[in-house]
UniProtKB/Swiss-Prot annotation:
Part of the 30S ribosomal subunit. This is Small ribosomal subunit protein uS3c. The lineage of its organism: Eukaryota, Viridiplantae, Streptophyta, Mesostigmatophyceae, Mesostigmatales. GO terms for molecular function: rRNA binding; structural constituent of ribosome. Belongs to the universal ribosomal protein uS3 family. It is found in: Plastid, Chloroplast. One of its GO terms (biological process) is translation. The gene is rps3. It holds the Pfam family Ribosomal_S3_C.
Amino acid sequence: MGQKIHPLGFRLGVTQEHRAHWFAKPSEYKFLVEEDNYIRKYLNAKLANAGVARIDIQRKADQVEIEIYTARPGLVVGRTGKGIENLIRDLQDKLRNKRKFRITITYLQEPDLESTLIGEFIAQRLQERKPFRRAIRQAVQRAKRAGVQGIKIQVAGRLNGAEIARSEWVREGRVPLQTLRADIDYSHCQAKTIYGIIGIKVWIFKGEKISIN
């Protein structure tokens, strides 16, 4: 049986960039990793409806720069324009440190090219008790309209309330997972339904590129 490797980790430094950019002393490393993880969890929970696809973190001395890739920047900024200020204040209060936070927003013009947002779309449909095949079909159609070269979606759990859990997958186009130069976007999420948790995995093939540079 073939052993599966994470599609993003497999391509780090080739076609994928790191989501965190910083160096630290060995004694501080684990604390900063935990802090990065907390920041991402907090922002994803706080901005659950803002279509956040990715959060990059960069550290410089005592400053933390956070870049949020979102399909709905208006929900992040807020009507009064103080949404970012409130997020920074909340992070400083919760982390209880003296670091300076800076948050920038990057607008995603084609959200259906992002595997994270496609997965969230399917999860939302499943939580609304929609048939899983219809949810997958709609997600594939949206991705194809956005211009992807290939997409693969896998769902696992008690699908449509079945007594026995199973997994099913659909693939449209090419998804070359063993090609390093293939620009693969991958994500996984969960849909919490009345029948239990359903796992969702999405692979999107956007084309080939030589390197991130």
